[in-house]
Amino acid sequence: MFSYMFWNNKGGTGKTSLAFQVICRYAYRNLGQRILAIDVCPQANLSELLLGGLTNGGSKNLLERQGLVPRCSIGGYFQLRLPSPFAVPDFSVRDFLTRPAEYNSNIPENIDLFAGDPLLELQANAINTLANTQIPGTDTWVTVIDWIKDAIEQVRDQYDIVFIDANPSFSIYTQIALSTAHRIILPVMADDSSRRAIQNAFSLIYGLKLPSDIYSKYAFATKLKQADRSLPKVHIIAKNRITQYMGPASAYAAVLRSIEKDVSNLIKLEPSIFTFNNVTDGVVEIRDFQTTGVVAFARGCPFYKQPFGKLHIDGHRVQVKEDYRDKCIDAIDTLVDKL
């Protein structure tokens, strides 16, 4: 069972919308495989999309799942672990999983969902405290970091691939998610804050270019390595929301080139943290989804199932052009081809 995580240390990069389309497209192209989507984000936007989106009751369906006993979400599972943080309790992970296709007919039936939950923010302080508790003979931090790993270990033979979407922060629940991932997909935008965010991401995950050596002892990478655990590798840099205005001479292109240059320098210095040896092999350009994306996400619909022509969305009449929709499908396929 292999796992990919969509993450960057910045919001607004289109991470969740990209994750939604990639997960659905991968599942559709690989109907013989079982896919598990894990939403480790308090906003739970990926879960809402998979469960129906704005116009098809995604929020209502998610609240219904969170209202079950036990609470059918990642927050419900963490709630189970809080009284038993250092020993795996007797439980079935199936109690916390959802089949999105039962709520949203647009979603392939080979996808299961570990839904997101706003409880994560409330639980974060308690989880942090437990992870930093000193108990002789117990590595409490690693034991807590393994919570998601403990859960999916039960169904390891039942899934072929796991996709994880996580909050842009580097909170404890994000670290729990990162420790579970084998590969990272880093979405970036054509702005300087994305460049800083990707630099921050490499510092936070791999402990690179820390401002002082005093931080290295407490770094995520240091703690995982001390436990003889491997770090996830960067697999794809996704240049997201590329438009026709981002030609070679544009300011946007200059920012994206600077990001590529930073990554290229890191490949030379730390080749072991990448799955590619040349930056061009790891970069994927994703065109801006425009109206097609707005409509698809409102309906909780993958692009390949998105009808074209005039559609009604929340009382408004909008038009989706067939060629635009097809270009969106092609853009997602360029990323899925690399998985």
Segments predicted by a language model, with ranges:
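Walker A/P-loop phosphate-binding motif and the immediately C-terminal alpha-helix
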Residues: 2-42
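Conserved catalytic-core segment of NTP-binding enzymes
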Residues: 2-4, 29-31, 142-269
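Phosphate/oxyanion-binding active-site loops and adjacent basic polyanion-contact surfaces
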Residues: 14-16, 137-144, 194-198, 324-336
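Extended hydrophobic secondary-structure segments that form protein cores and membrane-embedded regions
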Residues: 36-41, 112-116, 164-165, 234-240
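Phosphate-binding loop that captures ATP/GTP phosphates
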Residues: 43, 47-112
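Cytosolic-facing regulatory segments adjacent to core modules
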Residues: 84-107, 112-164, 170
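C-terminal lobe/tail of nucleotide-utilizing enzymes
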Residues: 218-339
